[in-house]
Amino acid sequence: MKNLFLLLCLLLLASSCSNNDTPSIDNPGEKLNIELDFQQRSICEKGNDFAGKLLLQTAEENENVLLSPLSLQVALGMLANGANEEAYNEIVTTLSMADYSLAELNGYHQKLITAIADENDPSVELALDNSMWFKEGFSVKNTFKENMSTYYNAPVNSLDFSNTEKAKAEINGWAKEATQSTIKDLQLPLDASTTMVLANASYFNGKWDEPFDKKNTKEGIFYGNDGKNYTTQFMNAKRPLAYVGTDSYQKVYLTFGNSSFYMTITLPKEGVNLRDILSEIERAKGEQAQIFSVKLSLPKFQINSLSKMNKILQDMGINKVFEDDESLNGIANGLLVSLVQQNSYFNMDENGVEASSTSTITGITGSNAAPIVEMKVNRPFVFAIHENSTGAILFMGKVVRM
C-alpha cells in the first residue's frame, strides 16, 4: 500500500457498550481519567483543532495518511522553548495555541506525559518518550535543558555526528525501544554538519473491548479513490455500538479495554468527497452519538510511512526556524532547523490496534431496543484514536486504498 504518514496527537473514541456474547477482558483495571482544569482542557481542544488542520493539509486525494498530532505537537512544544518571540508566535499560532503562555503549554504537556505514564489498563499499552542529542562540544543554554528535563522528561545527550553510522545507530536504537520495535530505522540524513536532533516517540497498543471473531473475517472489495478495486480481508460483527449518522457520513465508535481509549471510523456517504467531510466533522464537535445495533464490516489494514514535514509546516505558518539563525537563540546561537520528519506505523486487526510514531526535528548549526444500522467500510474513510477523559487525539488518518 502506498502511503503518506504524519503524527502528533492520538485519535481514539470510546463507547461503553458491551456484548455479553463476546468474551470480555479480565480485570481491566481502573479507567484512566486525566483531570484537566478549564485552561488545560481549552489547550487540549486547540490541539485537536491543529490535528484537523494538519490532516486537511496532508489529505492528498489518492494517498493514505496517518497522523499523530500529539507527537508533533509535543515536539514543536519542545522546540518552542528555545524560540525567540517571532519564531515562538509562528509555532503557537500554527498549533492554534497563541492564547497561552509558554509556561501554560509546558504545564499541559507535563500533565499529559505524567498521566499517560500512569495508565494501568492491562489491555492498553501507551507511552510517550522524548529525547535530544547535540553535537559534542556544542553549548546548550541551561534554561532550555532545565525545561526539557522538568516538563518533557527529555534527556539532553552529546553525540559525535561526524561518526554518522554510530550516531544513526544510537538514535535508531532509542526509537526502536520507544516504539516496541515497530519503527527501527528513522532514515535520518545525518552528517558532520548536524548539530541537533530533537525527538518524540509515541506508542499505542490497545485490545478491543470486544475482539472481532476471526471466523467472521471474509474477503471483500475495497473501492479506492484511485478508481481501483482492492481485494482485502474484512472483519465482520453485529453488536451495540455508539453511532452517528448524518446526510453526509456514518461514524462508529469502537472502544479498547476499559474504555479509556476509543477509535472512530467515519465513512462518507456514497458520492460524498472525503475531503468535504473533514470540515463537516470539525463543525460537528459535540455531536451526540446514540446506541445502535451496528452490522459492521471493517477492513484489516496496515500503514508504514515516512513523511518530511518542512513544506507542510511552512505552508501552515512556521518559517523562521527554517531560515533565521537567530530564531532558536533560546537553545543556542546560530541554530537552524533543517528537517522535521515523522515516521509512523499503524496496524488494525481482529484483536485491536498497534500504532507508533516518531517526530524528529533535526537542526544544523447502552439500549436494549437499539435500532439496527449497517456500516460497510468498503470505500475511503477517516479514522481516529482518542483518550477518553480529555478527548485528546493521539492518532488520526484516512484510508483511500488498500
Range-by-range predicted roles:
Residues 62, 102-269, 287, 291-369:
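Non-catalytic, conformational "gating/processing" segments within enzyme and secreted inhibitor domains
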Residues 91-95, 212-219, 276-284:
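Short Gly/aromatic-enriched secondary-structure transition segments
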Residues 3, 69-73, 192-196, 390:
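Short alpha-helical patches at coil-to-helix transitions and adjacent helical residues
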Residues 4, 87, 331-334, 340-358, ...:
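Non-catalytic interaction/Regulatory regions outside core domains
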Residues 198, 250-266, 370-402:
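Extended hydrophobic
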Residues 5-6, 17-161, 399:
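Detector for small/aliphatic-rich hydrophobic stretches
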Residues 1-15:
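Sec-dependent bacterial lipoprotein signal peptides
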